[in-house]
Amino acid sequence: EKAFSMLQLGSPKKKEVSIANLRLLTALYGDWIKNELKENPQMQESSFQATGKSIIEKCLDSLRRMNEGIDLIEKDENAFKAFTFMNQSMYLQRSITAYSKDCGRGIPCSLSDYMKDNKEKGIEQDHSEWRPFQIAFILLNIKGLIDPESDERNIVDLLYFPTGGGKTEAYLGLIAFIIAYRRLTSD
């Protein structure tokens, strides 16, 4: 199974597995901070120590925010529903993209072909997954999106990768999440 499968993360029946996979991401990130940053001799050099300390503190803060996002998904039913909706929406979008590419080339197909295993056409039902940085970005922004009292509302997080790196999906994921969350919680 893919750890960050949009199909799996979009399944309300797979909450425990989804939470465990998200927690694994933050555990591995925490290990990376410890092993690659804190214990990196270059971070201890006097000419880099202040900058190194600042980088480590920002990484630890991001880790904290990601864990808070997971906690909210785990404990707040509306956050969980919004998270599954986000994944279902992104999965459907990726299915439609694959469908459009093939049908645009004159290949006979139907959208349902892209939402189930179809060995004849070389299609897997579980065809789309988040990259770790995308799901991490979503997790670290959840609290600031849903808690009107959160100090995180004063933070602006931007992604930068060259074209084709996956920024748009991460931003669209957050948009789908907050649309669903607001719909679920509006009076």
Located regions from the model:
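Non-catalytic protein-protein interaction scaffold segments in large eukaryotic complex-forming proteins
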Residues: 1-9
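Low-complexity, highly charged intrinsically disordered N-terminal segments
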Residues: 8, 15-142, 146-148
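Short, well-ordered amphipathic alpha-helices
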Residues: 139-146, 174-183
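Conserved SF1/SF2 helicase motif Ia
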Residues: 151-156, 177-187
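Walker A/P-loop
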Residues: 152-175
